[in-house]
């Protein structure tokens, strides 16, 4: 079970990284706003 969770988590990290790179290339402004803390 632990191996399964590890595989899923690694896949999620890779997918999120790819999605972030694609979004940053499409709209860098949205990424900058998302990375900023809500408090300012």
From Swiss-Prot:
Subcellular location: Secreted; Cytoplasm
Propeptide residues according to the Swiss-Prot or TrEMBL record: 1-34, 40
Entry keyword set: Competence, Cytoplasm, Secreted
Post-translational modification: Contains a predicted signal peptide cleavage site in the N-terminal region, however the propeptide is probably only subject to processing events at the ends of the mature peptide.
Task of the protein: Signaling molecule involved in the regulation of genetic competence development. Secreted during production, but the mature peptide acts intracellularly, indicating that it needs to be imported into the cell to function. Stimulates expression of the genes controlled by ComA, a transcriptional factor that regulates the development of genetic competence. Acts by inhibiting RapK, which regulates the activity of ComA.
Record family assignment: Belongs to the Phr family.
Additional record remark: CSF, PhrF and PhrK stimulate ComA-dependent gene expression to different levels and are all required for full expression of genes activated by ComA.
Protein name, per record: RapK inhibitor
Organism field: Bacillus subtilis (strain 168)
